[in-house]
């Protein structure tokens, strides 16, 4: 099993990347949360991986954090959830937001994710209950911190400086979701 890869980021084509490790290019599928936090092509990076062998091929999935990889593996254990759907869930919600949605049984947050219908969302809530928060150490309060960090990262990626991002972050409610927070922060920054 391949648990980690360190190398030069050769290509970035969402949701896939190619990581050049000593002349061997490993193609990995990554959630968009990982994709947007990767350095530019040509830079060195380290990814934790999940290696899957199926009858149609061998697949590598990459993650920047252990929490993301753990959540991905927990999602794969849910009946009817494959790797593509698990990546979609992690692309739509941070690990903290997912843990909070499961802990608070927020069906609506899961249904907003592309490819997740009501029945699948209900199954996710049922089968993941207690598994994400306990094993990852994610509580409801760090979920807010994850969301705020994602909002800040998005603002920095859009070209705002740290001072502008911090100023906008102070004006956001404590329990804001990532997507709502980004929208609200952009509105606040456009008024300046």
UniProtKB/Swiss-Prot annotation:
One of its GO terms (molecular function) is four-way junction DNA binding. The RuvA-RuvB-RuvC complex processes Holliday junction (HJ) DNA during genetic recombination and DNA repair, while the RuvA-RuvB complex plays an important role in the rescue of blocked DNA replication forks via replication fork reversal (RFR). RuvA specifically binds to HJ cruciform DNA, conferring on it an open structure. The RuvB hexamer acts as an ATP-dependent pump, pulling dsDNA into and through the RuvAB complex. HJ branch migration allows RuvC to scan DNA until it finds its consensus sequence, where it cleaves and resolves the cruciform DNA. The lineage of its organism: Bacteria, Pseudomonadati, Pseudomonadota, Betaproteobacteria, Rhodocyclales. Residues 144-149 are annotated as: Flexible linker. Keywords: Cytoplasm, DNA damage, DNA recombination, DNA repair, DNA-binding. Belongs to the RuvA family. GO terms for cellular component: cytoplasm; Holliday junction helicase complex; Holliday junction resolvase complex. Its main location: cytoplasm. Residues 1-64 are annotated as: Domain I. Homotetramer. Forms an RuvA(8)-RuvB(12)-Holliday junction (HJ) complex. HJ DNA is sandwiched between 2 RuvA tetramers; dsDNA enters through RuvA and exits via RuvB. An RuvB hexamer assembles on each DNA strand where it exits the tetramer. Each RuvB hexamer is contacted by two RuvA subunits (via domain III) on 2 adjacent RuvB subunits; this complex drives branch migration. In the full resolvosome a probable DNA-RuvA(4)-RuvB(12)-RuvC(2) complex forms which resolves the HJ. GO terms for biological process: DNA recombination; DNA repair. It comes from Dechloromonas aromatica (strain RCB). This is Holliday junction branch migration complex subunit RuvA.
């Amino acid at each position: 099993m391949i648990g980690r890869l360190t190398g030069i980021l050769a290509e970035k084509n969402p949701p896939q990347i190619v990581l050049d490790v000593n002349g061997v290019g490993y193609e990995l599928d990554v959630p968009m949360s990982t994709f947007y936090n990767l350095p530019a092509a040509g830079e060195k990076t380290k990814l934790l991986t999940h290696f899957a062998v199926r009858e149609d091929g061998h697949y590598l999935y990459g993650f920047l954090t252990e929490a993301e990889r753990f959540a991905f593996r927990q999602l794969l254990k849910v009946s009817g959830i494959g790797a593509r759907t698990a990546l979609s869930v992690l692309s739509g919600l941070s690990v903290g937001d997912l843990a909070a949605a499961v802990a608070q049984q927020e069906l609506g947050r899961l249904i907003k994710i592309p490819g997740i219908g009501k029945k699948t969302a209900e199954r996710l809530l049922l089968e993941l209950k207690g598994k994400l928060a306990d094993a990852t150490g994610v509580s409801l309060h760090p979920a807010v911190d994850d969301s705020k960090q994602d909002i800040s990262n998005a603002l920095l990626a859009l070209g705002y400086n740290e001072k502008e991002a911090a100023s906008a972050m102070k004006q956001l409610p404590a329990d804001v979701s990532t997507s709502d927070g980004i929208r609200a922060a952009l509105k606040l920054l456009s008024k300046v």
